[in-house]
UniProtKB/Swiss-Prot annotation:
InterPro entries for this protein: Ribosomal_eS31, Ribosomal_eS31_euk-type_sf, Ribosomal_zn-bd, Ubiquitin-like_dom, Ubiquitin-like_domsf, Ubiquitin_ubiquitin-like
Cross-link (Glycyl lysine isopeptide (Gly-Lys) (interchain with K-? in acceptor proteins)): G40
Species, as recorded: Asparagus officinalis
A GO CC annotation given for this chain: ribosome
Identification of the protein by name: Ubiquitin-ribosomal protein eS31 fusion protein
One Pfam family cited in the UniProt record for this chain: ubiquitin
């Protein structure tokens, strides 16, 4: 079909409505007839996954969580309720978790286990 054909001379496409003299085409000049390709790449199928997505762990939100770590006594003095981790890499303000038999630092893994007599 003519609408899918293109004439090319010297690397340029010849436009409709112009003559060969406009492009300075002489006798014995070579013209290339090229078919125009329409469309793009083939449509890809959507991936189907065999395993369901892993459900991420949601951290429990506790309102005013700071109240667990400090207490203000009658005189107005602030008392720390949790033990701070003494490890240098944790830094100040890193509290250890209170368990029934031990204190545990979640940052560095340092654990203090209670003696049976305590």
């Amino acid at each position: 079909p003519p609408d899918q054909q293109r004439l090319i001379f010297a690397g340029k496409q010849l436009e409709d409505g112009r003559t060969l003299a406009d492009y300075n085409i002489q006798k014995e000049s070579t013209l290339h007839l090229v078919l125009r390709l329409r469309g793009g790449a083939k449509k890809r199928k959507k991936k189907t996954y065999t395993k369901p997505k892993k459900i991420k762990h949601k951290k429990k939100k506790v309102k005013l969580a700071v109240l667990q770590f400090y207490k203000v006594d009658d005189t107005g003095k602030v008392i720390r309720l949790r033990k701070e981790c003494p490890n240098a890499e944790c830094g100040a303000g890193t509290f250890m978790a209170n368990h029934k038999d031990r204190h545990y630092c979640g940052k560095c893994g340092l654990t203090y286990v209670y003696q049976k007599g305590e």
